[in-house]
Amino acid sequence: MECVVPFRRCFCLNPPETRHRIVNHNHRNLHISLSSSSFASGILPLSNKKYRFVGPLAQRSSLHRRTDSLKHLPFSVNASVIGNSEEEVEEEDDDGDWEAEFLGEIDPLDIQPPKKRKKQKNSKALEDTEGMDWCVRARKIALKSIEARGLSSRMAEVMPLKKKKKKKSKKVIVKKDKVKSKSIPEDDFDTEDEDLDFEDGFVEDKMGDLRKRVSSLAGGMFEEKKEKMKEQLAQRLSQFSGPSDRMKEINLNKAIIEAQTAEEVLEVTAETIMAVAKGLSPSPLSPLNIATALHRIAKNMEKVSMMRTRRLAFARQREMSMLVALAMTCLPECSAQGISNISWALSKIGGELLYLTEMDRVAEVATSKVGEFNSQNVANIAGAFASMRHSAPELFAELSKRASTIINTFKGQEIAQLLWSFASLYEPADPLLESLDSAFKSSDQFKCYLTKEITNSDEVVDAEVSDDVSRSPALSFNRDQLGNIAWSYAVLGQVERPFFANIWNTLTTLEEQRLSEQYREDVMFASQVYLVNQCLKLECPHLQLSLCQELEEKISRAGKTKRFNQKITSSFQKEVGRLLISTGLDWAKEHDVDGYTVDVALVEKKVALEIDGPTHFSRNSGLPLGHTMLKRRYVAAAGWKVVSLSLQEWEEHEGSHEQLEYLREILTGCI
């Protein structure tokens, strides 16, 4: 329907012969009624309340967008004729409008068409680290600072804004409601909780002080409310372990496995978590799917060699925290393989910096289910705790017993990893070592290959093992695995055992293997073998297992190369070194003792001061790790007096005066 309205009689238009055609494309009837007051002021009143007046530039632009025809409306408007109309409403809203404009929520010029809402992705795994929402959050922080300083009125003057107060017709509202209702599933994850992640330190400190003050009000009422919220969260998490739909479980598991990146895996899992939290029942989040999701995330990180900082940023995401919390909730219901996958995944994602309480939880559950573990589970769980420097004595005692009962099912790579784990955390492994001595007595049971073999120790699929344990099992090792086993026996002080003798004799067959100083793997292997050989010469010369002179020289040259052995002096070590000068003694820094480098040494009196940082100790128990104990024992066997100074003990003394007194105290009797 269209109507032609002659405006020549109503307005002084330039040019006067212009006629405007108004076409209604949406079947809305446009009724035009003229009055004498509107003639005088140059205003065209319309029956549609949304566009009651046409005169000011903002209204002219709006009508122009609707009709696409009225291009020559007058600019002058008689405010007295309009009376109390839209301008008064606009002036009342000016104080609040500048804030909306400052945050980018409205169009300051009102000349652009309204932005269409883009289709939002279901989940954004790394939105906080890679997205551009930090701009909006920075403006919100600035807005809080402006309001706190009482500068809102001045900002309103600096940023004037005339915003129309539009009144939408009922038909339009109904249509938009319909559209909004259809888009609800796509916007499930668009919450404002993510905006709290990247506030600056000043705002966080202010908010922390405010929380402390509020918590002390009303007799701790707010603290009680906080505890209730935690209980509600625990109840909500408990519903994830309820009955589930088998078909939904299979579909979710397939989607997790087919995801090619860690971000995709987390996105698929986060969708389901949010859906279950909003009432999806039965839940497809079975313990198997949760363990698989964590395992695939870690494996995809390994596949692309994701940097450590990137992994930590990934682990701090809200979706990732929810997934780990679910894994801890359903951990008792997981199978042995699921517990193994979760522990391995946490070690790869968080390393030694994250998941302290989570690993305690894993240790508790794993100890209760250790009887269900196979050789692969035992090796992977032990390796996860060792790589995170997380001590778990009770768990490792049970793992040693379990490994001794199924020793014939172990592969060479699994034995190497298990022994390295016990040695790294300096955990006793007598049942395991005794079973190795009894199961592998002959050197014919050991095979060595010089090239690296692709192993699948981290895969979910279990290895098939023959049930015929009556025959003598055979083990295959590569060069690096032999080095790890030999180093582990040296750390544990068990080089007199028969299994070590067989391993060491097999390792000597690598005499023809060419060691190069240009490759890190060769240098690491040579360093391990060199230290073990020195331990054999110093601690157990009666065994006569030390290497021949030619091979010893070759390994010594590769192990002592500076290409991959660059020394880094920590600030802690520098601080202690400055205080040692005041003792008046001639201390030597980075002194070499038969392959080991002593931090500070008094060479004349053979006193070695070891300045041990956090990497020398377990992160949760504070006990020395295996490599630290081996160094102390070896330097002591070389005839030196070893004094250890840990960072934790150092920080307990404040001020240089107290620290110097502590140094003199621990050195008493050695100098």
Curated annotation (Swiss-Prot):
What GO CC annotations are associated with the protein?
Answer: chloroplast nucleoid; plastid nucleoid
- What drives induction of this protein's expression? Down-regulated during infection with the bacterial pathogen Pseudomonas syringae pv. tomato avirulent avrRpt2 strain.
Question: Which stretch is the leader sequence?
Answer: none
Q: Where is the RAP domain?
A: 607-665
Keyword list, A-Z? Chloroplast, Plant defense, Plastid, RNA-binding, rRNA processing, Transit peptide
Q: What does the record say about the knockout?
A: Retarded growth and photobleaching phenotype. Enhanced resistance to the bacterial pathogen Pseudomonas syringae pv. tomato.
Q: Which domain of life is it from?
A: Eukaryota
State a single Pfam family of this protein: RAP
The GO annotation for biological process reads: chloroplast rRNA processing; defense response
Q: Where in the cell is it found?
A: Plastid, Chloroplast stroma, Chloroplast nucleoid
Transit pept. (range): 1-78
**Annotated InterPro entries:** FAST_kinase, RAP
The question of whether Transit peptide is a record keyword is answered with: yes
Q: Which GO terms describe its molecular function?
A: RNA binding
As for what it does, the entry says: RNA-binding protein required for chloroplast 16S rRNA maturation, an important process which supports chloroplast gene expression and biogenesis. Binds to 16S rRNA precursor and is involved in its 5'-end processing. May act as negative regulator of defense response against bacterial pathogens.
The name of this protein is RAP domain-containing protein, chloroplastic
| Species this chain originates from | Arabidopsis thaliana (Mouse-ear cress)
**In the UniProt record, what gene is named as encoding this protein?**
RAP
